Amino acid sequence: EQFTFDGGNNKKKDMKMKNNLMVILIFSFISFHCGEDKNASDPYLVNGIPVKWLRTFSFSSDSSSDESWCVRQTSDGGFIIAGATDYTGLLIKTDSNGEEEWHQLFNNSTTLYSVRQVSDGGFIATGYFECDTLPGCYPDIYLLKTNSSGSIEWDQSFGTDDNNDWARDVIETQDGHFVITGTWDDDGWNSKAMLRKYSNTGSLIWGQTFTSSVANEGNSLMETPEGSLILVGYSGTQHGAYNHFMVKANSDGQQIWKKKNESVGDALLYAVCEDPDGGYVAAGFCNSWRTNFLLERNESGNIEWQNCFIEESSNYGYYDIIPSSGGGYYLIDDLCYLTKTDETGNIIFSVRLKHVNQSVIELDDGDIVVGGFGFREGNTGGPISILRLDPSKVE
């Protein structure tokens, strides 16, 4: 996150320090380049794996201020990418081969962290808006609805008056409205994980917050078949002692259960999906070395299994997880490793890609598309990238 506070406001300075720490944490102390196969002469061969195509998009002179946080498949077989360039919200629509069809820039001082195509063919996206009127100005949640061409139908920013608020994920619910999750009322020390529901015209329907410690955040969100909501993130303190956090709420946002677990070192969840048997599988990092972490909770919130890969080097966490059509799960982590596991999280294969570490998608033919790229060297941006490969080449 690129919050740029100045003007001598202490709370803003605290928030800047907090978000600098969050960038280091959530985007993984990134002082490396995602690995390339040094022995491959073919640029579409990565660690011996044929990559069917690789597309990159650049909107700044050296990509240093380009960000891409989320990639989703669209109903026409193409893809939608959410991010920012030069601190301006960005959506990119591609065809099924990853070629750009259009892009749209939005309000200055915005970043889009999540996007999904919705039932009318348009898109819902969310992130934050950082106003540039100082002093007395704090980051707010930004929510944006576009048509199928990316033109704005409505957008709005909202939050607490004197503290910081931002959204990490958004979904369309079964009734055609939208729910977001993220952080609410962050003063640099205390914060709340939140769920907020908005109508399909942008009106607030309800808002709920959840805490298990002084600092709490929601990172990812899903709706269950019966209409309940699952959010995952962390609960702990602003500057360490992170515990993985999962909340189940009903369709009105009322808490059904809330689970926070202590661990050796920090633990945090970035992504969640439904297990085919009805449980909830979440991914993130664990322990003081911030290695990759998976766990499953059943519908009552009890842990079915968990895997903290402490024998691995520090991969700094899985950022996305999806069920595999052949059983098990696909994941992408901070160091650009695409991993497949079985149904209980045991690794089947793991291969290092390049320039992609945020989102993973399985296509109808079994191919995998991976895209999005978090902060790189010196907490700057990087190439906005998306690639397609055949995972059977490494199974």
State what each model feature region is.
Residues 4, 15-48:
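Bacterial Sec-dependent N-terminal signal peptides
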Residues 6-8, 30-31, 71, 344:
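Intrinsically disordered, low-complexity serine/threonine-rich segments
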Residues 9-10, 14:
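Intrinsic-disorder-associated, low-complexity terminal segments enriched in Asp/Asn/His/Tyr and depleted
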Residues 35-395:
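A sequence-level/structural motif corresponding to short, flexible coil/turn segments enriched
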